[in-house]
Structure formats: C-alpha cells, structure tokens
C-alpha cells in the first residue's frame, strides 16, 4: 500500500466488503426505565438485501449500493461504479477473499482498467477490513432493535446512514507511515 501511495499521491484507497441486511431486527441490550421493558417487533420472514460498500480510508467517505445478490458479476458492477465515481484517479482496492471477489469477469475488468489495483486481506481477518467497522457502526445505529414496520424504509435509512456519515476508522494512520498520510 505504501508503494501505491507513493506512486499515486492523488490516488484513492478504498476498503470494500459486501454485507447482508435482514428485516428481522437484531436484538441488543439497551437501558430502559425500571418497569418499562423495551418492545422490539419481529417479522416472521427472512427478507434481506445485500449492500456493497467501499470506504475511502483517507477521508472516511463510504460508498454503498444495495443489491439482490453477492456474486462476481455484482462485484464487477460495483467496481465499475467506483471507476465511474473516480474517473481520473488510480484506485487501490482492499478486499477480503470471498469467492465472489474472484473470477474471469473480474480478471477481464482488471485487464481493461490499469487504474484499478486489488490487494487482498489475509484469510479469516475481518477485523483488518475498515469496511467491516463501518458495517458494525451502521448496524448499531440503524439495524439493532429497529422498529421499522416495512423493509423499504429500513433499507433507505441504512443506505442514507452509510452514504452521509463520515467514518473515522484510523486505517491510514495505523498502516501507512505518517509522512505519506500527509501527501
């Protein structure tokens, strides 16, 4: 990553990861006045949607898009969106080793776009991926103990939170020499 930052001072460093959002609220502990037990409605369905997200680790901006599935084709589509959002800048994309992050379609995209470089995190190390921390914050803020009666408003609230909240993960400071963080 240090090499990328030196070669492309104006380049974008993104950490990418998909996640699944279920309509069923996840329960967490909360404080409540004595005698007033919080009520969280449940839904008997397993309605869900996936989000692809990429965090700009320098500036804390997250780019998130909902999708119906996690496949290599959807990964390629999301990467094409990233290339359109940053039309002139080199992009270093940090991602995990999920099966849908590999494949001939992805290889072709990389061959056709020399501005895009991929670096894979070590296996079974989700804590290294800053996007995982974004998912955690979004779930805590929107998904846990929610009282949405319909799925569409939950999806909208989740996507709005992701795209409008600045995230300070401290990734660059932790993994890149400080002299390069100022570039």
PLM features: residue spans?
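Extended, low-complexity cationic-aromatic segments
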Residues: 1-80, 177-183
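Short, aromatic/basic amphipathic alpha-helical patches
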Residues: 103-113
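C-terminal anion-handling pockets and recognition modules
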Residues: 10-13, 131-183
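Short, well-ordered coil/turn elements that cap or connect secondary structure elements
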Residues: 8, 88, 111-115
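Mobile genetic element proteins and their domesticated derivatives, centered on retroelements
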Residues: 17, 53-54, 60, 79, ...
